[in-house]
Amino acid sequence: MTGVQTCALPIFCQTGVITGDLQREAAKHGLLYAGDPSSADSSMIGGNVANNAGGNKAVKYGTTRNQIYSLKVVTPTGDILDAGARLKKCSTGLCLEQLFAGSEGVLGIITEVTVKLRPMPPYTFNMVCVFKTDEEAFALPNKILKAGIDPTSIEFMDNEALRMTCKFLDMKMPHVDEGCDYVIVTVESFSEDDSDRKMEQLCDLAEENGSIDEFEADKRIWKLRKQFAEAARDVDKMFQTEDFVVPLDKIPDITKQIPELREKYDLYCVTVAHIGDGNIHVLPLNAKGLSPEEWFEKIKAFHRDLFPRVYALGGKMSGEHGVGFKKLEEFALCTPEAELNVIKAIKKALDPNNIMNPGKLVQIC
């Protein structure tokens, strides 16, 4: 990192910088880097940009592409490109920095990033709303957003996910043993009065929608949420994580179909979600000890059934993890031909020799 400029609020960094280190450096100056993937303490900013990582604060601040001013990129043909600029607005040419954000490394090598920083809100609370049913929990986020509470995060953990992660961390949390789900809501404010008002408003709204308890959580709640993937890996080294995304008003429609799919394919699944932006992680776990070949065939069949349902609701198969090679076949099946042709044309124009991450995102051979 080459320094924070507090006037225009950028910070310049090379792509190997750990996301959590970037967050902590900004915080030293009373500033916030809003990109916050659950892997912040291990993921690098270059990977965040290339994958357009989302994370816990995307409800308020957007994904990684919303956090960048500019990129330095080495193209497949050896040119060095400065894409974007440290400007608040620009209508000059194409937004090339946005082309490379989320491109999964197939268009060039990102070497430097100029990211946006924001003033750090001095007041923050984390509220856990406890629900007995998934349906009640999934109905809350849209109502929070419509109420004008302006949350930073709205996260969901079902009871299976809570039990698994609490066991992994040897942690006790309220109502987990009662079979309940959590909706975790973070709200940032610049005044104590505003924070208090929003806390009261949130509690009232949660109770109106079936919450059996609301409690202000300490930092353990984010440890619980962010260690979920490690807990899953402890149970099943071959675990698969889905991260499909649907419009907010379609969350109840798709989540009602998950139990049907679980039963149809005889899958044990746990679910967490960045539910405030419609990004849902359903993790099938190989609880019955199938061979790798049997397991991956079952997951492929599950995908072939799940993704068309997601697209029928106006969603996409990935909200933040990307396509890579694991979802390459399904991406080609679900994506309109005109869209695929544009992606292939861009890839061929920038990488005529197909040397950048071949076989990922799109197949051009």
What are these regions (language model features)?
Residues 105, 282, 351:
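Conserved, mostly hydrophobic/aromatic
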Residues 233, 237, 244, 325-339:
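C-terminal polymerase-core module
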Residues 79, 328-365:
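Activity-critical C-terminal alpha-helical subdomain
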Residues 115, 119, 128-133, 138-305, ...:
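C-terminal substrate-recognition/cap domain of FAD-linked oxidoreductases
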Residues 1-7:
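Single conserved hydrophobic/aromatic residue that forms the stacking wall/gate
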Residues 8-155:
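FAD-binding subdomain of flavoenzyme oxidoreductases
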